Amino acid sequence: MAMVTGGWGGPGGDTNGVDKAGGSYPRATEDDSASPPGATSDAEPGDEERPGLQVDCVVCGDKSSGKHYGVFTCEGCKSFFKRTIRRNLSYTCRSNRDCQIDQHHRNQCQYCRLKKCFRVGMRKEAVQPGPIPHALPGPAACSPPGAAGVEPFAGPPVSELIAQLLRAEPYPAAGRFGGGGAVLGIDNVCELAARLLFSTVEWARHAPFFPELPAADQVGLLRLSWSELFVLNAAQAPVPLHTAPLLAAAGLHAGPMAAERAVAFMDQVRAFQEQVDKLGRLQVDAAEYGCLKAIALFTPDACGLSDPAHVESLQEKAQVALTEYVRAQYPSQPQRFGRLLLRLPALRAVPASLISQLFFMRLVGKTPIETLIRDMLLSGSTFNWPYGSG
């Protein structure tokens, strides 16, 4: 297994630091495999296809899509190598730097995968720099009126993408649950969580570029990223989503044989609360939340995407928008962009199963939350939400 660090190093050693570009924060359990036959991705000089010639990827053994960066590779290994070089990523092996890299294990250790890319002859100098972004003019103050805790933006105009992300924000009302300092009971906590989940899906439905994607891609992206989006929404909510009432209720029903399991569960719950609190301490504004959610949503590593390269380009658009926005709005905080981006891998470390068990077990029982999300996404406003809309 590998963990992402920053800077880029060759196959001979690690570099320390942080992931400067955030990457698509690769998931060890998800396959960033090749695009389906017929899908196209941006070509680089030296890319060469051989129609009718069956050649295996020299990195992982999957079916190659042509010659990329000097050798025959599949689309998955091509994209992995391009992403690593463009974003100046490096990785650390958690084993002995000799992990097996094949079609079924290529995503389990990015360090050894990159090492093999170099060993078989992939050339970093063949990777072109990413496209140079052009900021689009937008309204100077595009914060939705009445958004709790959000001040209108001052200074340079924000990009049109950020303006669209802000318009997609549902901003759930706080009045039903009292003020920001209110202590909610367990029923109210579960209800607020349900509304945040619904808001997560509604935000995605109205996020720029998302509605134009095939329905299967929409479902795949949201099923993969819903837990990260939920934590971001929980941190952004006008009413804090505290876990203390749920922990207290869990403690009352914990049997003596479940003590060890309960300790592990509570550690995970504290990790969830810690991520929410860290986002609060960063004082993330609405535009930054929108960009972070878009980066999390458009992950090209989701399985079964019809065009992973297109999804990756959408993620890059959101990342560029965040970079430009932070540089313009917070010129005195040069580390802010890196601190924001580092929140995303940390959010991914909060298990989706924990969020489902903690907040939604009382609501949906054993129904997988991913099934509920799919139904919510495809049904739209006609979805029969248990808590209603009042």
Swiss-Prot record:
ZnF (NR C4-type) ranges: 57-77, 93-117
GO biological process, one term: entrainment of circadian clock by photoperiod
Stretches for region Disordered: 1-50
UniProt KW Membrane keyword: no
Gly residues: compositionally biased ranges: 1-15
InterPro entries cross-referenced by the UniProt entry: NHR-like_dom_sf (IPR035500), Nucl_hrmn_rcpt_lig-bd (IPR000536), Nuclear_hormone_rcpt_NR2 (IPR050274), Nuclear_hrmn_rcpt (IPR001723), Znf_hrmn_rcpt (IPR001628), Znf_NHR/GATA (IPR013088)
SMART domains named among the record's database cross-references: HOLI (SM00430), ZnF_C4 (SM00399)
Cellular component GO terms held in the UniProt record: nucleus
Subcellular locations according to the entry: Nucleus
The NR LBD domain, residue ranges: 157-380
GO molecular function (one): nuclear receptor activity
PTM sites of type Phosphoserine: S35, S41
Function of the molecule: Transcription factor predominantly involved in transcriptional repression. Binds to promoter/enhancer response elements that contain the imperfect 5'-AGGTCA-3' direct or inverted repeats with various spacings which are also recognized by other nuclear hormone receptors. Involved in modulation of hormonal responses. Represses transcriptional activity of the lutropin-choriogonadotropic hormone receptor/LHCGR gene, the renin/REN gene and the oxytocin-neurophysin/OXT gene.
Classification via PANTHER family: NUCLEAR HORMONE RECEPTOR
Description of how the protein assembles with itself and partners: Binds DNA as dimer; homodimer and heterodimer with NR2F2 and probably NR2F1. Interacts with THRB.
Protein family (similarity comment): Belongs to the nuclear hormone receptor family. NR2 subfamily.
Listed name of the protein: Nuclear receptor subfamily 2 group F member 6
Organism: Rattus norvegicus (Rat)
Source organism phylogeny: Eukaryota, Metazoa, Chordata, Craniata, Vertebrata
